[in-house]
């Protein structure tokens, strides 16, 4: 009887391993295909947009989704430089993860345990989060974020990652993407954004629901000045240089 129980447990463990392995394979194949499709097809809606719409419905403050997709060549080079300066100085150099920035952020957070935490998410990581995942702060979500970051860096070009980032990122209540933001705040298309306007929009990205580029607080105004000072020194993507 005892031997039969042990044998039965081993059989169950074997079946569980097979099921788990099968699920992992299906998950990889499915997500690989989705990321590959988005290399060529622009997403209509993202998980974050769905969450924001649901939040608006339940709070009776529905603002809808304001979004207009624009190819990277119809977005001002100033905006590309502004987000690289603001969010990810080594965007063109890393493979999705800026280990130097991660170490620096970890050291800073250790020294300022009671202050505001500094993040080190790259533009690639933010794109993975914005396009594929629902917003949360769990380690599980971080794990999926790293996984999708690996996939988009593997399958997409840096140009496509930047294009997706600038078209899907949240830039205000109900505002997604740089074209909608440019029209909302400055009443101009994204391709006509000046350095100052681009830096002002980039400065609100850490807290787009609480900040406004037209009414910057002291911290945001300081950030705008810092971004402007960095824009001329960041490495310019080749697609920007070709478009000039």
Swiss-Prot record:
UniProt GO molecular function: pentosyltransferase activity; peptidoglycan glycosyltransferase activity
Compartment(s) where it occurs, according to its Swiss-Prot or TrEMBL record: Cell inner membrane
Keyword Membrane attributed: yes
Transmembrane residue ranges: 18-38
Biological pathway: Cell wall biogenesis; peptidoglycan biosynthesis
Keyword Transmembrane helix listed: yes
Signal peptide (residue range): none
GO cellular component, one term: peptidoglycan-based cell wall
Principal place of residence: membrane
Membrane topology: Single-pass membrane protein
Protein's job: Peptidoglycan polymerase that catalyzes glycan chain elongation from lipid-linked precursors.
Family to which this protein belongs: Belongs to the glycosyltransferase 51 family.
Name recorded for this polypeptide: Biosynthetic peptidoglycan transglycosylase
Organism: Cytophaga hutchinsonii (strain ATCC 33406 / DSM 1761 / CIP 103989 / NBRC 15051 / NCIMB 9469 / D465)
């Amino acid at each position: 009887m005892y031997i039969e129980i042990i044998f039965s447990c081993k059989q169950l463990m074997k079946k569980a391993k097979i099921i788990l392995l099968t699920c992992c394979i299906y998950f990889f194949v499915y997500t690989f295909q989705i990321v590959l499709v988005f290399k060529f097809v622009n997403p209509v809606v993202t998980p974050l947009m769905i969450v924001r719409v649901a939040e608006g419905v339940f709070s009776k403050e529905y603002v809808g989704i304001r979004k207009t997709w624009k190819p990277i060549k119809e977005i001002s080079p100033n905006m590309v430089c502004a987000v690289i300066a603001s969010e990810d100085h080594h965007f063109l150099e890393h493979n999705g993860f800026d280990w130097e920035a991660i170490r620096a952020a970890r050291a800073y957070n250790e020294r300022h345990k009671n202050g505001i935490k500094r993040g080190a998410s790259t533009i690639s990581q933010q794109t993975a989060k914005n396009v594929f995942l629902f917003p949360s702060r769990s380690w599980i979500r971080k794990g999926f974020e790293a996984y999708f970051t690996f996939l988009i860096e593997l399958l997409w070009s840096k140009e496509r990652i930047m294009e997706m980032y600038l078209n899907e990122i949240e830039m205000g209540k109900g505002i997604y993407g740089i074209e909608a933001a440019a029209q909302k705040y400055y009443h101009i298309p994204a391709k006509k954004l000046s350095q100052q306007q681009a830096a002002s929009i980039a400065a609100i990205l850490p807290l787009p629901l609480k900040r406004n580029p037209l009414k910057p607080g002291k911290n945001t105004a300081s950030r705008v000045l810092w971004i402007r000072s960095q824009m001329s020194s960041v490495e310019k993507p080749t697609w920007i240089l070709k478009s000039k």
